[in-house]
Amino acid sequence: MDPKISYFQTFIVASKTKSFSKAAKRLGITQGTVSNHISALEKYFDAQLFLRTPEGVDLTPEGKIFYERAEKILDLLNEAKLLMRAIHENPEGIIRIYASTTPGEHILPSIIKEYKSSYKNVDFEITITDSERCFKALDEGLADIAAVGYLKNKNYEYTIIGKDRLVLIVPPNHPLAEKGTAKLEDILKEDYIDREEGSGTREAFIKALNDKGYSIMDLNVVMRLGSHSAVITAVSEGYGVSVVSEIPAKKAEDAGLIKIVPVVDLDVVRYLYLVKSRRPKNPSAVKSFWEFVTKV
């Protein structure tokens, strides 16, 4: 069996004190344990390390060879420990994040800005895609963290970073905008701008439809687009209506591009999540960022 680090420490102290009993007292262990540690080392190296004397113990020639190297080994281990601690306290490198549109464009930037005010040597590489591809990137080792609009399953380590409401958006001059409210059946009558498959927004809306006894097939989908901004542009230009995240929708409404219309019989609220890879490429930086986010 390979020797433990504690055996090296016992050997060094016994060498310096020239006594197993003094070594035991200094280390807070029994003299028998000291003897066992030394015996294990002697067995491993197939060499006698100490000579027993009336006064205590002295190093053999083999023991002197090992003493010099054991001290270096312990010094290197302590140095490595200090360097690792420094990395944990001052992480550096890149954290790779795959993010769906809403958390990636509207939630993460402020979190990252606050984090980087304390950890300037950590940089972020963010890829915006749909939630399904975010999970795939995690599983394939392409992402250290994913920011998504739904949980694929509960086997991932995750934390909630926000809450989002889905809202109906229509062109500014649309009859529903003038009416001021809508019902789910009104959406079913309109040309609908859908998000791409794998979108967290789309998944949440489909679930809401299913809960009401409908399906995606009941919508008159005229096009599918890959981001909220593309959907908002299509709606503003009169191609149809859509259900999107309230966060970008409010910005677009303030800019006069679309109108948000409350749907009296539909209330879709979802959580936004950060999900951590089981095998991050930069463990220290990811650990630091994760602890920062979960403590906020």
From Swiss-Prot:
Record keyword Transcription present: yes
Domain HTH lysR-type: 1-60
UniProt GO MF annotations: DNA-binding transcription factor activity; transcription cis-regulatory region binding
SUPFAM superfamilies, sorted: Periplasmic binding protein-like II (SSF53850), Winged helix' DNA-binding domain (SSF46785)
InterPro entries hit by this protein: LysR-like_Sec_metab, LysR_subst-bd, Tscrpt_reg_HTH_LysR, WH-like_DNA-bd_sf, WH_DNA-bd_sf
Transmembrane residue ranges: none
Ranges annotated as DNA-binding: 20-39
Gene Ontology annotations of biological process type: regulation of DNA-templated transcription
Keyword Transport: no
Name of a matching Pfam family: LysR_substrate
Protein family per UniProt: Belongs to the LysR transcriptional regulatory family.
Protein name (record): Uncharacterized HTH-type transcriptional regulator MJ0300
Species, as recorded: Methanocaldococcus jannaschii (strain ATCC 43067 / DSM 2661 / JAL-1 / JCM 10045 / NBRC 100440)
